[in-house]
Every structure is written in C-alpha cells, then in structure tokens.
Curated annotation (Swiss-Prot):
InterPro entries hit by this protein: Rgp1
Chief location category: cytoplasm
Record's keyword terms, sorted: Cytoplasm, Guanine-nucleotide releasing factor, Membrane
Name of the protein described by the UniProt record: RAB6A-GEF complex partner protein 2
Coiled coil: none
Gene field: RGP1
Top-rank taxon: Eukaryota
GO biological process, alphabetically ordered: negative regulation of protein catabolic process; positive regulation of GTPase activity; retrograde transport, endosome to Golgi
Top-level taxonomy: Eukaryota, Metazoa, Chordata, Craniata, Vertebrata
Length: 394
C-alpha cells in the first residue's frame, strides 16, 4: 500500500493570479505487525488545477456538447483526466506537471515533491449557487505499475478581486527586496507583490466613507430617510445603516431589511417556464433585521456579510449581485395616533385598535462586497491543510 499526502502550507483559500504551493509526500508505510515487506514501484505522478462547472438542468438550458471534440486525448498529452468521475464540465485547467517517474520506495521510505502553479485570472470565483456551481480542485494523479490511475483531489476556494485581471507582474528590478541582504525566490516575490497590490486596492475601495442619504416614499408621501456611509464592503464586515422616520408624513408601523444575493441566469441560457423550468432568478438571504417602529424617530441596523460567501461576479451563463432588500409596512390612515390621550376625565382602560389598514412596499439598494484581508494575510506558519489518499495493491 502506498500513502500519498498533499499539504497546502497556507490553507485552501487563494486569490486568482496567486501562486499555489503544495508539498506531495509519497510513503511506503511499514506495517507495525508485519514481519516482512517489499518495495513498491510507482510509474508516475502528475498534478494540475481545474475548475469544474455544473448547471441545474431545471434552471439553465446549456447548448448540446460539441460532437467534433474527440473523446480521447491526443498522445502528446498526459492520460491524467482530473475531472474523471465528476459531474459537470471542466471549463478551466492548468497544464499538468509531472512530479516524478519510475519511483521505487523501500518499506518505510518516503519522498516529498513540491508543486507550484499560478491560479488562472480568467476563471470565475468559487461559487455554489441554486443555478450553477464553480468548484476548483487540485488533482494529483498517481499510478502503480500495471494498475489503474488513482486520483487525490484537494478542494480549493478561489476569490476574484475586481481590477486584478489586467495587472501584469513587473520586472525583477521593480520588485527587488528592500534589503540587499535578503534573498527571495521568484515565486515569493510575485506572490507577495500581488498580495500587497490586492490589499492596497481593497483598502482604497472599502475605506472611503461618505454619507449617502436616500428618501423613502410611497404613493402617499414620505416615509423616512435612509443613510449609509459606503457601498463597497469586505467579506466579514458589517453593513451598518440608519433610518430616520421622524421627518416622514406617512406612519411606518414595521420595517425589515435583508442582506441578499441575486443569482440571475443570462437570457440566452434561461430555460422556459412552460417546459418545466424553474425561475431564472433566485435570492438567498444571508442576514435579516426586523423591527416594529411606530412612534420611532430614528433607528439603525447592522448586518454581517458572511466570510464564506462569494463576492459578486458575472460570467456568460450567470451573474451574482448583492443588495439590501427593504420591506415597509405603512398605515393608510393619515396622522395615525395610537397613544392614549394625555388627559382623561375619569379612569378608563385604553386599548389599541384591533385592525389597522396598511400598505406594503419594498425597495432594493445594491451593494458590493469584495474579498477580505483575512484571506490575503494568512501566514504560512499559522495554517496547514493536508489531504491523504491511499493507493492499494491489486
């Protein structure tokens, strides 16, 4: 039996354009109760990164596959199929890299190999939605002599930061170490430069604070004013807003605000509803705040953006957008007063009305979450992610 261990030193979360580094260790373990063991021979091992795409048949109408594409890969490529046995289509893959060939391990012996690859910037981010799924994996294929190929898959999470797709890595002199006594390899320079640039762009986009005011009105008058300081946020940050109802001419009885994502299938890929298709637009609520606000002049809310969520993006098949979805319940009666009178001629019991005629309306405000600094500042020594696989003899 051969044991293969893949270890990511800095965790499974990466930025598109960043270099992934993985250490693959191949071991021929020595059984503790075995009296004798033989050496094991491995023909080869290869690794590559691929993005698997899967669409819901009830929501997305994909064109038929191209029959002109051959089912068998040409002899010039490796026989490794990273997406073998998985649902969907492989829409993006890096060139395979050979880790070793003709490896023989004695009992108890192990060998380690380093794999490095830059994550493509032209691909979509990792996403699991109602209509489509984009899943990234690092696949390591290993084959024993005269045995089938065994695959080891390491799940990855890839984030895309707006504006980095067109950035080119500068020349060596532009990213030289600040100290002449420090040495840094080419991959480390590029990785640190990209992380620093992403952090600067993210800070510039999310640190700008300017109060934006929105008048909220229905068909009968003004309900209130909503205030928010910015529209670009980081994953894990709180969306804070204030609502001023004291200036309104229409009484607001209750309001709710939801932090939602809108997943919309592009028109050319939408499945017709008459053919048994599901809606082409789906909404997911990540956080919600509800409050009864009669006689409330000013209130506020705070909604956290989950770290596990995906920032907005757009592909040829689907788009994802974020929004604040407001729902207001207002009174139809002008000048509604539900307080007891201040002066009572004699002791009496006051009760509120059993029924109040109301109207409801909604309002959507787009916002834009971006990748978080939490993912851009993970230190190699603080996180270790490993996956194990066993290759057994026939």
């Amino acid at each position: 039996m051969i044991e293969v261990v893949a270890e990511l030193s800095r965790g499974p979360v990466f930025l598109a354009g960043e270099a992934l580094e993985c250490v693959v260790t191949v071991t021929n373990p020595l059984p503790p109760t075995a009296t004798s063991a033989s050496s094991e021979a491995l023909a080869w091992a290869s690794a590559q990164i691929h993005c698997q795409f899967h669409a819901s048949e009830s929501r997305v109408a994909l064109p038929p596959p191209d029959s002109s594409q051959p089912d068998v890969q040409p002899e010039s490529q490796t026989v490794l199929l990273p997406h073998r046995g998985e649902r969907g289509q492989c829409i993006l893959s890096t060139p395979p890299k050979i880790l070793f060939c003709d490896l023989r391990l004695d009992p108890g012996e192990s060998k380690s190999y380093s794999y490095s690859e830059v994550l493509p910037v032209e691909g979509p981010p990792s996403f699991r939605g109602q209509s489509v799924k984009y899943v990234y994996k690092l696949t390591i294929g290993c084959q024993r002599v005269n045995s089938p190929i065994t695959l080891l898959r390491v799940p990855l999470r890839v984030l895309v930061l707006t504006g980095l797709q067109d950035v080119r890595f500068p020349q060596d002199e532009a990213v030289a170490p600040s100290s002449p006594f420090l040495e840094e390899d080419e991959g480390g320079k590029k990785d640190s430069w990209l992380t620093e640039l992403a952090g600067e762009r993210l800070m510039a986009a999310t640190s700008c604070r300017s109060l934006h005011l929105y008048n909220i009105s229905d068909g009968r008058g003004k309900v209130g004013t909503f205030g928010i300081f910015k529209s670009v946020y980081r994953l894990g940050e709180d969306v804070v807003g204030t609502l001023n109802l004291g200036e309104g001419t229409v009484a607001c009885l209750q309001y709710s605000v939801s932090l939602q994502t809108e997943e919309r299938v592009q028109p050319e890929y939408q499945r017709r509803r008459g053919a048994g298709g599901a809606p082409s637009v789906s909404h997911i609520t990540h956080a919600r705040h509800q409050e009864s606000c009669l006689h409330t002049t000013r209130t506020s809310f705070s909604l956290p953006i989950p770290l596990s969520s995906t920032p907005g993006f757009c592909t040829a098949i689907v788009s994802l957008k974020w929004r604040l979805h407001f729902e207001f319940v207002t009174s139809r009666e002008p000048g509604l007063v539900l307080l007891p009178p201040v002066e009572q001629p004699e002791p009496a019991t006051w009760t509120g009305p059993e029924q109040v005629p109301v109207d409801t309306f909604s309002w959507d405000l787009p916002i834009k979450p971006e990748a978080s600094h939490t993912f851009l500042s993970v230190q190699p020594a603080s996180y270790c992610y490993s996956v194990r696989s066993h290759i057994r003899a026939i």
